[in-house]
Amino acid sequence: MYASNKTYPSSRALPCLVEKVEAQHVDGAIRVRITTLEQKDWRQAKAAAVEAKYEAEREIQLRAHGNVKDIEITRESAFEHFATDPWAQHVGVDIEAQRERLLAEPGSRKILIIGAGFGGLLFAVRLIQTGRFTAEDITMIDSAAGFGGTWYWNRYPGLMCDTESYIYMPLLEETGYMPRNKYASGNEIREHAERIAQTYGLATRAMFRTVVEKLDWNEAEKVWTVAGSMLGIANNGQRDNMMSFQMVSQFTIMASGSFASPRVPDYPNIFDYKGKLFHTARWDYNYTGGSVENPKMLGLADKTVAIIGTGASAVQIVPQLAKYSNKLIVFQRTPAAVDARNNCPTDPVWWETETQAEGTGWQKRRQENFNAFTCNEKPLPSVNKVDDGWTRMPSFSILIGGPQGLDPDYVDRMRAVDMNRQEKIRARAHNIVQSEGSADLLTPWYPGWCKRPCFHDDYLSAFNLPNVELVDIRHNGISHFTANGLVANDIEYELDVIILSTGYTVPVTRASPSSRANIAVSGRNGTTMEAKWANGLATLHGVMTRDLPNLFFAGTSQAGACVNLVYALDQNATHVAYILANAFDRRPSDSARVIIEPTPGSEEAWAMQVLQRAAGFRGIAGCTPGYLNGYGMDASSLSPEQQINAARLAAWGEGIASYVRYLEAWRAKGDLNGIELTFFAKF
């Protein structure tokens, strides 16, 4: 027999990397000759096999994804509770009295901020820090009953942030707060939002449980007319006893996040289900038992529990459900790519030494060090300060942009780097999960940037527990619901409770701020924000656009994007605060109103800059369906004009550092170049 002394690493679910096998009879025996590939050829063949597996997986999911619509939860009485606020009665604030007091303030609001999460808070704080504005100049509005945005709504068991707390939790330097762990719990993050509000006098400046529905520019008065509804507080914050309201504001800032409204897929016969049904973003501790502070879900001890979806939220929830449920069934379409998190308590000695040694501005420098690694800057800093799974994933720059993104071979280079990382992720699943079948199902076959990477130390091992079952629905999906459960793969599962971990109603394309917030925005001459986004977007720096004067917004379209969303929001806030403060300084008198908007030429020039860099995101094509790529939307089906309009909606393709440098250089000139200022004397 012919034998080779070479050994080759195994690769599950991949073809054997052998070039030729020959067999012949010699002297009554069978002699086999195996011709193996050389190392370079082996790597190429392996890469081709992985790419083929990626494409096959994508095709399976595109066929299975189908056309499942979403239920409009505010219009279906059976699902109204998905839109309610289960925490409204526990905030310790007289929300109705505070709303009435703020509404009774005479005259127009100077600055209205829509959203009281970290985005809204950062806009408010950076405005106050200019010295031109005070907290009394600011009114904040949010549909929640407290500060925190997505961290207000999400209180499910196991909730944590997968971005390091020292860079994610804003204004640590200003508030003097030390996070308890490297990765903070949702509870701690929400408390920090409240701390910021208290520190800057904003706690009494918010109209909670209030929804803005319309913004209309009054050209004669040079103000925004704001119309909406004040929601009920009783009955767990249901949308009862709504009262309409109207106010006017000189300036409006839209800081609504993208993760507020739960996504409820309209599965066939979902209305027939008689058991308990809720969404992870509206966790029902009354049913499960436990609380936010102590999530011992003893109410599930005799229950068969299903969770649909295995994204970032489910990765954190599944280990907790597995611990307390009699039976847990996890319905999975796309497996998460789960790396280690390695959380640890903050060492006070290290904290004191680190912050003192770094001095003023330490948090911003740490954030930017993190950005350099995740955007794959060249050259990289000599020290990786955060040094975690994110900073060891340069391929994620395909999704958020980076300075090398326009290199012709960049996507190919990142595919090679990412393939090694994903191979380790796949090996990790097989090393931890004992069942070969479950391990195969939990193995991700897609580039790492196609889904949000996850980091958790207990998720995969939860599938080793005898009370946990994994159901693969990527081929056929969920067929329909029944009175007692649901049907998948022609099997009916009887369930006491179904938990939807199906994400949020994020539009499938880079939607306008008005679409994300469900607000109708109409500017000068009836120009709508929706039309601006649909018909060839042009902005100045991604924060303002012509014919919507005195209106500012946060987002990624024509602005910088990064893993650490809070850093990007802070750059938006710092920039807008500078513009507003400098515009106010130029008023001919204190009583004069200022109207701010970009010139047509400046916003079109900025759009062209964005277009020139949009090719940096070309690696997103070919991903498995998900909200990051419009659930598999095929750009080739668009007309050339539609493709250009879509490219105008992209983020700044050179990465967040390039974007910030551009803004800082623009501010350093001090001339508000590209902005048209007019002044209006109000008598």
From Swiss-Prot:
Q: Which organism is it from?
A: Emericella nidulans (strain FGSC A4 / ATCC 38163 / CBS 112.46 / NRRL 194 / M139)
The molecule here is called: FAD-binding monooxygenase ausC
Give the pathway annotation: Secondary metabolite biosynthesis; terpenoid biosynthesis
Reactions catalysed, as given in the entry: preaustinoid A + AH2 + O2 = preaustinoid A1 + A + H2O
GO CC list = membrane
Molecular function in Gene Ontology:
monooxygenase activity
The cross-references to Gene3D superfamilies, in alphabetical order and at most eight, read: FAD/NAD(P)-binding domain
Q: What happens when the gene is disrupted?
A: Impairs the synthesis of austinol and dehydroaustinol.
